[in-house]
Amino acid sequence: MAEVNISYVSEFILKGITDRPELQAPCFVMFLTIYLVTVLGNLGLIVIIRVDSRLHTPMYFFLSHLAFVDLCYSSAITPKMMVNFVVERNTIPFHACATQLGCFLTFMITECFLLASMAYDRYVAICSPLHYSTLMSKRVCIQLVAVPYVYSFLVALFHTIITFRLTYCGPNVINHFYCDDLPLLALSCSDTHMKEILIFAFAGFDMICSSSIVLTSYLFIIAAILRIRSTQGRRKAISTCGSHMVAVTIFYGTLIFMYLQPKSNHSLDTDKMASVFYTVVIPMLNPLIYSLRNKEVKDASKKALDKGYETLKILRLSK
């Protein structure tokens, strides 16, 4: 791509989810509530996993990083989105837009591969339980988390640099509630054909690689479960993977709908609704999915709440 690093646009205007005045206040309250639940849920999950020694296992190590990623990419999008409901003209500076796009891509791609790492962890736990502690050593776990972070950062940096080296010399209204690649390309007066190919290629590669790991892991897991003769053993194995399967289905289903459909079928309004789901709703759902279906997390949460309540009682009595 031979575009010169010159832009006639110093800021963008985010159109937001809706421009209907009667929906602004209800939407603000709804998304504020969702964001608060997201922050409390993910932060709470991270804290509980860190402080409870019973949860210092590979599965919860990955889960704490998933909660961190959900918290980060929701925070990169939701606060700015809510501004659109309380101001008439929601502007974002050129460089802030680049930063938001970079953060969003980094954490979204990281989540793809973290879910794959978690699927591999479940595969080892069910298919090779006797070798679990060796195969999922601390060093291996750190590598399975570090690689997604480093890879996603490099890919996000690459895409962000290319997108913001394009020339923006005309309209600056982004038909979206955050800075995303496709809506930005619609505003560029440069040739965006190569960039569109790169988006499709990288999105396809990331989803095919990560989903292949997930799918292969679960095929082996299902085969192992079918070989278990006792009903109780099968239930225990299924409960171990149930939460992760739900989270994977929701996340990948939304991304496939968003990025791997033909260009002729793309509607920015439809994409906007899909984006709301995976940038706002999924980060809220994940801690609920993993905690409500997990006895160990529920027990640890109850223990932490009881301990906090006892501490408050002691503080009150000491006054």
From Swiss-Prot:
Ranges per topology, Extracellular: 1-25, 76-99, 155-196, 259-271
Annotated InterPro entries: GPCR_Rhodpsn (IPR000276), GPCR_Rhodpsn_7TM (IPR017452), Olfact_rcpt (IPR000725)
Location within or outside the cell: Cell membrane
One cellular component term from this protein's GO annotations in UniProt: plasma membrane
Membrane-protein topology: Multi-pass membrane protein
Glycosylation (residues): 5, 265
Cysteine pairs bridged by disulfides in the record: 97-189
Cytoplasmic side: 47-54, 121-133, 218-237, 293-319
TM ranges: 26-46, 55-75, 100-120, 134-154, 197-217, 238-258, 272-292
Keywords, sorted A to Z: Cell membrane, Disulfide bond, G-protein coupled receptor, Glycoprotein, Membrane, Olfaction, Receptor, Sensory transduction, Transducer, Transmembrane, Transmembrane helix
Domain of life: Eukaryota
GO terms, molecular function: G protein-coupled receptor activity; olfactory receptor activity
Role according to the record: Potential odorant receptor.
Family: Belongs to the G-protein coupled receptor 1 family.
Name listed for the protein in its UniProt record: Olfactory receptor 8U3
Source species of the chain: Mus musculus
